[in-house]
Structure formats: C-alpha cells, structure tokens
Amino acid sequence: METIAKHRYARTSAQKARLVADLIRGKKVAQALEILTYTNKKASALVKKVLESAIANAEHNDGADIDDLKVAKIFVDEGPSMKRVMPRAKGRADRILKRTSHITVVVSDR
C-alpha cells in the first residue's frame, strides 16, 4: 500500500531540496529519518517533516506497520517564484527570485 504526503510551496529551491531527497530515496523509513536528522541542510528539516507526515498517514489511514515501510518515491518539483526587487547603485534595480518547491514523499510497505 502506497501512502503520500506533500508539502507545497516550501520556501527552498527545488535544486537544494533535491540534494537531500536523493539521500533517502529507496531507504527504510527508520534509516531515512536518521540520515535526515544528521544532515546539515535547511531542506533536510522540511523533507523530514514530510516523511514523518507520510509515516503517520500510513499508520493512521492504512494501518501499515512502520517497521515495513520504505521510501518508495520522493521527488521535488518547482513551485512558483516570488519576485522581489533589490536596489542597486546609480538608481538601478535587480530582480530577486525567491524560489519555492513542492516536496512529495511516497512510502510503501512493498
């Protein structure tokens, strides 16, 4: 049984979050949580929260045994970017893109 959890509009770039997602793809959830706990990245806290939500969904909604669960799929898609202006010298301005991402975690007992 596959169970899904999503975090939409996460305030991190998809490129940075994918580095963390690649670390836990295909691992058992206990091992994945341990890896995320000791990974020193902002995105690891966001991914860990989504993984914990997926585990809770599997246990509560599907009655799955936590010991059998593994990270079947994890992917990070780009969300919309917030456009901001950074004033520069001589009256110029640069556009700053504050990027967001959609983090999706699928856990499975198979």
Swiss-Prot record:
One of its GO terms (molecular function) is structural constituent of ribosome. Keywords: Ribonucleoprotein, Ribosomal protein, RNA-binding, rRNA-binding. The keyword rRNA-binding applies. It comes from the Bacteria. PROSITE patterns: RIBOSOMAL_L22 (PS00464). Pfam families: Ribosomal_L22 (PF00237). GO terms for cellular component: cytosolic large ribosomal subunit. The keyword RNA-binding applies. InterPro entries: Ribosomal_uL22, Ribosomal_uL22_bac/chlpt-type, Ribosomal_uL22_bac/org-type, Ribosomal_uL22_CS, Ribosomal_uL22_sf. This protein binds specifically to 23S rRNA; its binding is stimulated by other ribosomal proteins, e.g. L4, L17, and L20. It is important during the early stages of 50S assembly. It makes multiple contacts with different domains of the 23S rRNA in the assembled 50S subunit and ribosome. The globular domain of the protein is located near the polypeptide exit tunnel on the outside of the subunit, while an extended beta-hairpin is found that lines the wall of the exit tunnel in the center of the 70S ribosome. Part of the 50S ribosomal subunit. Belongs to the universal ribosomal protein uL22 family. NCBIfam families: rplV_bact. This is Large ribosomal subunit protein uL22. It comes from Aggregatibacter actinomycetemcomitans (Actinobacillus actinomycetemcomitans).
